[in-house]
Swiss-Prot record:
InterPro entries: Hexapep (IPR001451), LpxD (IPR007691), Trimer_LpxA-like_sf (IPR011004), UDP_GlcNAc_AcTrfase_non-rep (IPR020573). It catalyses: a UDP-3-O-[(3R)-3-hydroxyacyl]-alpha-D-glucosamine + a (3R)-hydroxyacyl-[ACP] = a UDP-2-N,3-O-bis[(3R)-3-hydroxyacyl]-alpha-D-glucosamine + holo-[ACP] + H(+). Gene3D superfamilies: Hexapeptide repeat proteins, MurE/MurF, N-terminal domain. It comes from Geotalea daltonii (strain DSM 22248 / JCM 15807 / FRC-32). Homotrimer. Its EC number is 2.3.1.191. This is UDP-3-O-acylglucosamine N-acyltransferase. GO terms for biological process: lipid A biosynthetic process.
Amino acid sequence: MGKTLKEVAEYLGGRVIGDENAVVGGLGTLDDAGEGQITFLANPKYAQKVATTRATAVILPPGAPGHGRNVIEVSNPYLAFAKLLTLFYVAPPKALGVMDGAVIGQGVAMGKDISIYPGAHVADGVKMGDRVTLYPGVVLYPGVELGSDVTLHANVVVRERCRIGNRVTVHSGTVIGTDGFGYAPDGKDWYKIPQIGIVILEDDVEIGSNAVIDRAALEATIIGRGTKIDNLVQIAHNCVIGENCMIVSQVGISGSTKVGNHVTMGGQVGVAGHIQIGDNVMVGAKSGVPGNIPANQIVSGIPAFAHRDWLKASSVFPRLPEHRKTLASLEKRVQELEEKLKADEKVK
């Protein structure tokens, strides 16, 4: 259903420049949007496309040229784009109840407007808030607790006693609360250390597909409020991840590491165990983090160090073979000069 630009602007907290009664019913890119759609400019390098877009309206930052188009000005066009996708395309879930083929254990407490699909398995003593959706193949072990507005996609597993907060989404194939990797050597074999702790996902966490978060050995592995974790991430036992972190695909964080708030880790970062990473740290892709990082640092490399220094060092790497030849030539020349000086001394 379409909305006027006035309605859209009110929803976004922006202002209309142009025809506030123009109607839009969807979004598109600057290149592909047409009549009846709205587009946005988030990257200044595409500003010239505003003049040629066929969209009915453009979302722009304050002061950006509109080239005669209908404009909605907002402080953050990219955030506005995300909100409009929700407005136009994300339908509120419809409560389906417990469908045939779902398995529900004894003593399960369920809130209102639940949807549990065929093939889901809810064990004894599970507690769920309102508007929880469990897709086929979801398995909740005994004693799991889910808040309200939780969505667990197909084949998610939540192990015993783990706790998930409100408005949490976990995507297909992820395991929450698998055993931590803990073994004690006895001089001959490895003795498994029972992992009796849990995992806690706080409110507004989202976790991608095929990620694994290990349960703590004794207490809790914690993922802080608002943190987003990409596909194929491994977080080991006893870790504490702060609030509003962004952890990209294939990151591995070793056990008992503490990560602060608003930390960003690029793809394939490896983090050692038993270290601390401060607030607002950014770690570049493929970095190896062997030790503590103070707050507000940007690091990259293997081992990770200051990002600017890493850029300088990495610019030298491709020329190392050439520099090695030059160094060998200089060493040879120095040796020749030293031998000549010795010969001259003997002559004197």
